[in-house]
């Protein structure tokens, strides 16, 4: 069956009158620059301006608008070139110098930006630019001067909020953004800024809620989707974060190219450092966090020297930078036995943990715990760790530090439980872990487990140190059988007279426990070979006494 057509497939235009065609053509408006600007379609406006320039169409202030649009699409180099060309003209408006300063600022040319801005007229834009430059130059006096010139208008208040954010005063920034939002509900992008502040305050769930408001209206925002991925990383894991980031890559919006480096950087973080050496080094001067994450990568690889080289010349300005410098100095101090580096680390931790903005945050309290840990003030360590332990359920690194503090204060039972919760193989193979666990076993009357821990250790210098610990701790605790075994093993490795004295005392101690009925008589069979392995004249005298007692008490040797 053939279906008849209501309209012809081709040639339908023939029925349209020429008058109707003219009417339709007239209804198609030629795009105007004002329309693009009103819609904030700066890329469209820039395209139109370029077309008009190439076509020889004269537009009033075309060069100014070209610089303006280039700036707003993120092409700051193009904006700089346009504004520089304008400054060479004798009739150049004085405000152009400030616009040039803004472009130079975003290119990281701060000195040149200041020089250009000072040639411009004294406007609120100039004040805001100089305000931000004072922050970049760490010039507190100038910063406060420009701060006083700010007015209670949206642009100035947003500028102030930005400075608060960069100085880690996140709550102050939130207060400003919320106040502006109450007056201007249509300023949806401010929700992203608020969400960023909550992210920095570690309130990842709150950040996610605020961000959702913006994403409902602008679902393909690069910055918002990237922040959502970062929240997922903090709330869940790297896999969940990577899924969110892949959604961003799939969208490939017009701003995707601009955020390419950011996405590459974050993928490395979400994947636990995979590809760090290929991706992060070129981004060190592009993304501030790239240097910090590369330092973290080196720390995880136990390459403390490389981590130190990368961060030693960094002048910290944020809590994260102070913390990381503290961690690197602490690790280096422990590795090379440098008290100076440990002292620097302690000072960095104290600076962050004692600051008004960080003292009640989780990282701030961890810093104070680290500070007191280095000072060996373990009661204070526990005060701070107890206050944040609910946030670190099943966190092996936290459990490791918490257990050490407990053990240092003699809470061996709790410390043992914490040590045994740890699943991370790297931590479990660390001598510090093994020595503390062995001590806990011994103090909790479990010397056999401590001995088995030694037997499982691979051949290195560490087993010798662990043997010394087991020998001495078992001796102190009256666990003479395992003390004797440890001193015997030490003596075979190093014929030091002190080890013989320890073994002799432990063997006599075992004999005393047997006499008191607190140790099995059968152990005497193991004691005699240990004594005979030493060529000391005292050996025969001790063995003779033990043999006589065994004979009198019908103990087979």
UniProtKB/Swiss-Prot annotation:
Sorted alphabetically, the Gene Ontology cellular component annotations on this record are: ciliary basal body; ciliary base; cilium; intraciliary transport particle B
Swiss-Prot/TrEMBL TPR repeat ranges? 60-93, 95-128, 154-187, 471-504
- Asked whether the UniProt record includes Glycosyltransferase among its keywords, one would answer no
- Main localization (coarse): other
List the biased-composition ranges (Basic residues): 21-30
Q: So which domain of life are we looking at?
A: Eukaryota
Spell out the subcellular localization from the entry.
Cell projection, Cilium
Q: Which GO terms describe its molecular function?
A: intraciliary transport particle B binding
The UniProt disruption phenotype note reads:
Defective cilia. Morpholino knockdown of the protein results in cilia defects in the pronephric kidney at 27 hpf and distension/dilation of pronephros at 5 dpf. In the eyes, the outer segments of photoreceptor cells appear shortened or absent, whereas cellular lamination seems normal in retinas at 5 dpf. Left-right asymmetry defects with abnormal heart looping, hydrocephalus, pronephric cysts, abnormal ear otolith formation and curly body axis.
Keyword Cell membrane tagged: no
Q: Where is this region: Disordered?
A: 1-30
> Could you tell me the Gene Ontology terms of the biological process aspect for this record?
axoneme assembly; cilium assembly; intraciliary anterograde transport; intraciliary transport; intraciliary transport involved in cilium assembly; photoreceptor cell differentiation; photoreceptor cell morphogenesis; photoreceptor cell outer segment organization
Q: Which InterPro entries match?
A: TPR-like_helical_dom_sf, TPR_rpt, TTC26
Q: Which UniProt keywords apply?
A: Cell projection, Cilium, Protein transport, Repeat, TPR repeat, Transport
Q: Give the matching PROSITE patterns.
A: TPR_REGION
Job description of the protein: Component of the intraflagellar transport (IFT) complex B required for transport of proteins in the motile cilium. Required for transport of specific ciliary cargo proteins related to motility, while it is neither required for IFT complex B assembly or motion nor for cilium assembly. Plays a key role in maintaining the integrity of the IFT complex B and the proper ciliary localization of the IFT complex B components. Essential for maintaining proper microtubule organization within the ciliary axoneme.
Its subunit composition reads: Component of the IFT complex B.
Family per record: Belongs to the IFT56 family.
Q: What is this protein called?
A: Intraflagellar transport protein 56
Taxonomic lineage is: Eukaryota, Metazoa, Chordata, Craniata, Vertebrata
